[in-house]
Amino acid sequence: MKLIASNKKAYFDYEILETLEAGLALLGSEVKALRQTRVNLKDNFVKIIKGEAFLFGVHISYLDTIHAYYKPNERRERKLLLHKKQLLKWQMEASKERLSIVGLKLYFNQKNRAKIQIALVKGKRLHDKRQSLKEKALNKEILADLKHHFKG
């Protein structure tokens, strides 16, 4: 698995409940741009329209070598390739419990297919974010103390 991009902001802003791997329907120039890691996953989300899942808000820059006539929209919606059962299950859960679906990681799998890891998420409140920052700082401090203790 070759990681292309990661949505670090999603781990901070949301509580991740469940993850799933999905394929992407891309143009050839977009795949070439992905190989050069010209992608930004910040502020993306998945919307289910008429029984199909679409990824919005992902910015894939076009290449410099592309002809001026053919310049695709860099922020266009991209279709996600999922099984119907998975899609319907997540659609029901998201609408019932007021959850969102966001993309976490974009990568190439062993067969060199572009895949995205999507997650069913619940938004964190401000005090939850503060709590996670405190835990992160505490863990960092503990690791530093352990390292110092065993080192000398």
Curated annotation (Swiss-Prot):
GO MF term set: RNA binding
Keyword RNA-binding: yes
Domain of life: Bacteria
Primary location recorded for the protein, binned into one broad class: cytoplasm
Keyword set includes RNA-binding: yes
Keyword terms: Cytoplasm, RNA-binding
Xref: PROSITE patterns: SSRP (PS01317)
GO biological process, any: trans-translation
Subcellular localization(s) per the UniProt record: Cytoplasm
Record-linked Pfam families: SmpB
Cellular component annotations (GO), alphabetically ordered: cytosol
Family: Belongs to the SmpB family.
Function: Required for rescue of stalled ribosomes mediated by trans-translation. Binds to transfer-messenger RNA (tmRNA), required for stable association of tmRNA with ribosomes. tmRNA and SmpB together mimic tRNA shape, replacing the anticodon stem-loop with SmpB. tmRNA is encoded by the ssrA gene; the 2 termini fold to resemble tRNA(Ala) and it encodes a 'tag peptide', a short internal open reading frame. During trans-translation Ala-aminoacylated tmRNA acts like a tRNA, entering the A-site of stalled ribosomes, displacing the stalled mRNA.
The protein, known as: SsrA-binding protein
Protein encoded by which gene: smpB
